[in-house]
Amino acid sequence: MITSALLFLALLPNHQIAPQTIDRKALVDRHNVVLTEFDGARPLQVGNGEFAFGMDITGLQTFAPFNTMAQWGWHSSPLPVGKRIEDFNGQVWDTHGRPVRYPMPDPANPEVSFWMSANPHKINLGRVGLLMTKADGSAVLPSDLKRTTQTLDLWAGVVTSRFELEGNPVTVKTACHPTTDALAVQVISPLIKLGRISAFLSCPGDNPRYFANHVGELNSPATLETLRAEGNRVDLVRKLDATSYHIGLQWSGKASFGPVPESLNLPIQIVKAEYGAAKQWADVTYIVSKAITNNRLAIRVNSDNLVPDPAVGLGKLLRVTYSIGSQAQVVEANEGEFMVIEPSAFGKRLQLVPARDADSLAFTCTFTPKRLPSNLPTVESAFDSSRKGWASYWQTGGAIDLSGSKDPRWRELERRIVLSQYLMKVNASGSFPPQESGLVNNGWYGKFHMEMIWWHKAHYALWNRWPEVEPSLEIYRKLIKNSVALAQSQGYKGARWPKAIGPDLHEWPHEIHALLIWQQPHPIFLAELDYRAHPTRATWQKWAPIVEATADFMASYAHLNPTIKKYDLGPPMVVVSENTNAKITRNPTYELGYWRFGLRTAQNWRRLGGLPPKSEWDRVLKNLAPLPTQDGQYKTYEGIPDMWTKFTYEHPALIGAYGMLPGDGVDRPTMARTFDKVAKTWDFERTWGWDFPMLAMCAARLGKPEQAIDFLLHTSSGFQFDARGLATGGPFPYFPSNGGLLYAVAMMAKGWDGSSNGNAPGFPKNGQWRVRWEDLSPAP
C-alpha cells in the first residue's frame, strides 16, 4: 500500500505535489540582504511594527539622516493665531437633490483647512550615528569607507555592517528589541582606542512636509533636557510644543556622555552635489558651492537654478554631500523645495565617547511617549530578544517555498515574498494602520489611508499571522462614533468610514477623501477573514456592530434611480482611480461589485448571529445597478466616455471585482474579455504598485496562471523591489505593493473559494513551477 501511494504521488504533475515540511530557516536565509554601497536615499531597517530605525551602510544614521519612527510618534503644530477648529465648515454639495456637507477645504477658512491637513503629522524621533575622524582629524565621508559590506540576518533581525577606514576595520551590529521601542548597537574597532570613533544622538526640528524622505528640520535640531544621568545611563526628554517624549541611553563599559563641540564657525564644504532622478544625474557641485553665502546655503531646487533638466518627465531631487569640520552628512531636497544647509545642522548633538582602553562601544537607545521605566533593555538582552522574536515569527504562520521550480524566475519571486514578510512585520504590524511608506519616511504627512488597510493587512489573514493584524483592526472600534456622526450629518444611516486620518481620528479635508467610497466595505471583508479563521461567538460579537453599521451606511448610500428602478452609487463620488469627474461618476464596476459582496456578507453575518436578514439591505442588494458594460467588456463606470483611449491609466480597478473580490455580480466571460483588453492597452507606467497583484489575482481566477506570474514579476517601474525588498508603486517606498504581493501569492498557492482542489491553483501547470506551502488559508 505504501509503495502504491508513493508511486501515485510520483506520477502527479509537479504543480500537484502535496504540501511538505519546509526548511524555513533555509528558505529565509537564502534571501538575507547583502549591501556593499552607500545609498543616501534607501535605508535598511530594523524594527518591530511599533518602532523602526532606518540605517545607512554604517549600520547607523552616520551620513544619511534616515528616520527613527514609531506608531505613537505624532505632533500637532499650534493652530494659526486667532483660529479655531470649530470655524471649519467644509463644503456643501448637491447630492441627489439634497444639500450635503462634506469635509472638504473650507473656502472661508483656508488656514484652518490647511492646518487640519498637515496636523497631526508623523515626526522623526531622533538620529543615532557614528562620529569618525581620519588620522589627520578631518571629516570622514562615505567615499572614505572601503570594503563595505552590510548583511541583514533575516532570521535574527540583526544587521552586521563591516567596513575599513584608513585600513582600520569597523564592525557595527544593529538590532531592535521585539517588544520595546529600543535600538541595540555594538561597535568593535581599533579606532576606539585611538579616540577616533564615538556615537552621537540628535533630534531634528519639526518640519511638516507633505512628503519627506528625511523627516524633520536638520538645520533646527532640538534641545534635549536631561532628567537623569547616573552611572551608565542617561534619561532625556524632548519637548515640542505640546508634544513630549523620552529617550533613554544605556551603555556597557566605560564611556562618557555630553555635547559635541559646536562647529558654528567652521565653513561648509560641498563635497558632491548631483541633481536628477533614476539613472539620469547631473553633477552640480560647483553650482551649489557657489550658492553658499555667509556660510549658509539656500537654493531652490529646479532646473533654472541648477542645470537644464537632466531627467525630463521625472520628479527630480538635489542630493548633496557636505562636511563641516570633522562631521559630514548627505542630504536631499525634492524639485521645487528649498535646500538649506547651515552649520547649526550639527549643533546640539550629544556624544557617547568610549574610554580609550575600550575595545568596543555597546549601547541601547530607548524611545517612549511616557516616562522611561526603571530598567532599560541591556545590549545583550536586546540582541537575544531580537533573535528569539524573529525566529518565532518565521516559524509561525505561513510559508511558501519555490526552490524546486524550473522557471528561473522562482528565485526573484521567492525573494520578494520573503523580504516582504520581513518589511511588513517591521512597518505594518503595529497598533495603527500604517501609512503607505510605513515607518520608513513620511508621505501625505504620515497619515494612514483607510482604503489601503486591505492591502496592508488582509495578507496576514491568508498567512495566518493574526498577532500582526489584530491590534490595528481596533481602528474601526475607535472610529465608529465619529463615523456614525459623519453619516448622520449627511443624512445617511450607519457609519461612513473616513479616508485619510491620524491618531486624532479626524478626516483630512479634501475632495477625494470626502467622496471616496471603496474603503467602506473593507471592515466587512476583514471581519469575514477573521471569522473564517476564528469561527466563534466571540469573533461574531467583536465584529457585529461594525458590520451592521457598515452595511447600514452602504444600503442608505445607494440611491434609487426613479427612471430604471435600480439603486445607483453616486454621483457625487470618487472611484478607486481618482481620475474621473466626481460630479458625474455613477455606478463604477469595482464599487458595485464590492457593494454586493458587502451587503451579501453582512446578511450572512446576521444569520450567523441568529438574527433575521434586514429587508432594506435585501432590497438594495437585489436591485443594485448592474456592472456597466460596453462592447462585451466592463467599464470603469457607467457612461464613461473614451474609456480605452483616455482612461487607461491609474488603477484598473474594474479588474478587482474578480480578483481581489470573489466576483459578486460579475459575468466571467465578460471579465475575461475585460482582462485581456486591460492587459493589452493599459499604460502600466502610470499605475500603482498594488495594481499588479490585483491583476495577478484576476488572472488566477480566470485560469490564466502564466499571466498571473507575469504580473507579479512585471517590468513596470511601478512594481520593482530593490535589494532590501523596498518596493516602488507610489511615493517610495510603497508597502501596498508588498502587502498585495503577499495576498496574491498566498491565494495562488492555497486557492480561493471555489478553486480547484489541486495544489497551487493559481500557479502555472506547465511543469515549471514546484510550489510547496504551509499553514496558508484560502481567499474568499
Labelled PLM ranges:
Residues 549, 553-605:
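Acidic/histidine-rich catalytic neighborhood
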Residues 432-447, 497-515, 570-588, 718-730:
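Acidic/His metal-coordination segments adjacent to aromatic residues that form catalytic metal sites
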Residues 14-265, 345-446, 466, 479-484, ...:
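Acidic/polar, glycine-enriched structural segments that form the non-catalytic walls/loops
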Residues 61, 82, 449-482, 502-506, ...:
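Active-site core of glycosidic bond-cleaving carbohydrate-active enzymes
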Residues 110-144, 604, 739-778:
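Catalytic cores of secreted or luminal carbohydrate-active enzymes
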